[in-house]
A protein has these predicted regions:
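Conserved donor-nucleotide/metal-binding helix-loop-beta segment in metal-dependent transferases, i.e.
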Residues: 1-20
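A glycosyltransferase accessory/donor-loop signature
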Residues: 34, 39-183
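Flexible glycine/proline-enriched surface loops and loop-helix/loop-strand junctions
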Residues: 18-23, 52-55
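A recurrent flexible, glycine/aromatic-enriched loop bordering the glycosyltransferase active site
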Residues: 24-36
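Short, P/G- and charge-enriched loop/turn segments at secondary-structure junctions
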Residues: 21-27, 102-107
Length: 183
């Protein structure tokens, strides 16, 4: 398996402790994001990995479900691919916990500048909001080129919409500010 490091988890001491407790992740072991995976399907099938991973996920209460099961199963046995292939919110928002760690900051800024895949993990889905530059404009640009361009999409809870998008926009503005300083 090959994947990108999950910088949101790698940068958080609290979550790293949680992963140590839940899946036995040692403090020096990298943790990957399962949003974009490269797999040797022949080896995957021959090793019957799916059954083992499903069993792990079924028998445990992992906070990140299949991602934790995959990380436990492939601990120390996966390859890292460049972060640009799975850019998650902690990266495109340049969270402080990433900015304060020079090695992670460098990876995040490089991925943000050369993004190939945006992975809208977490609570902010691009289709729940009108077009906002830097957040979901590329999503809408590519959606307009597909057969799904006129499909009705799920909408965010309107009671939280304004507060939440304001928070997200503030994060994006801060990320733009940090990009100017660190790039």
């Amino acid at each position: 398996v090959a994947a990108t490091c999950d910088l949101g988890i790698m940068a958080s001491g609290r979550i790293r402790k949680q992963k140590h407790k839940q899946i036995g992740l040692s403090f020096d072991a990298p943790y990957f994001n399962a949003g974009v995976l490269m797999m040797d399907l022949k080896k995957w099938r021959e090793g019957n990995y799916a059954a083992d991973i499903i069993k792990l996920a079924s028998e445990n209460q992992f906070s990140n479900h299949d991602q934790d099961a995959l990380n436990k199963f492939f601990m120390y046995n996966w390859q890292e691919i460049p972060l640009k292939w799975d850019v998650i919110p902690p990266v495109f928002n340049l969270f402080t916990k990433i900015l304060t760690k020079p090695d992670l900051r460098k990876k995040a800024i490089e991925a943000k500048l050369k993004s190939a895949i945006f992975h809208y993990a977490g609570g902010y889905k691009p289709w729940e909001y009108e077009i906002y530059h830097g957040f979901n404009d590329k999503y809408y640009e590519y959606l307009s080129k597909t057969e799904f361009r006129d499909a009705k999409m799920p909408q965010f809870d309107k009671r939280r919409k304004n507060r939440s998008i304001k928070r997200q926009l503030l994060r994006l503005r801060l990320a733009d500010f940090w990009m100017q300083i660190f790039k």
